[in-house]
């Protein structure tokens, strides 16, 4: 357990090294904290990107009119990933639809059963073909298993007599 914790800690420290200066932000001090360049550090700012928030450490004199990806180069990959996730979620919602409305509406279940019957009568296409073939293979395997079981039952009846 301790070894797992140690390995995890080392992996996280290697993957996410601490910033150059690791010190607390001096909020109540009268002396402003200065960088070697003479610029004053601002407290962390939450930058909103979609539904996710990113912490930004930087100078208060920066131009806030820039886009989040331009003003925070260290978070550009995170912002791209967040946008990709949002796009994926929207695409999935568009294809699947609102699942919650299907659960609440029992009338649609009857329509779904009618739709399934209609689909079983029609020749399957593309992805449906794969599932159709899989279903038929499973049915054939089940029928073969039942035939073997019936044959073994007949043999047992012949051996032991009725």
From Swiss-Prot:
Record family assignment: Belongs to the sauvagine/corticotropin-releasing factor/urotensin I family.
Any Pfam family hit: CRF
UniProt GO MF annotations: hormone activity
Signal sequence annotation: 1-24
Function noted in UniProt: This hormone from hypothalamus regulates the release of corticotropin from pituitary gland.
PROSITE patterns: CRF
Pro-peptide positions on chain: 25-119
Residues carrying Phenylalanine amide: 160
Record keywords, A-Z: Amidation, Cleavage on pair of basic residues, Hormone, Secreted, Signal
Name this polypeptide is given: Corticoliberin
SMART domains found in the cross-reference section: CRF (SM00039)
Entry GO CC: extracellular region
Keyword hit for Secreted: yes
Subcellular location: Secreted
Main location class: secreted
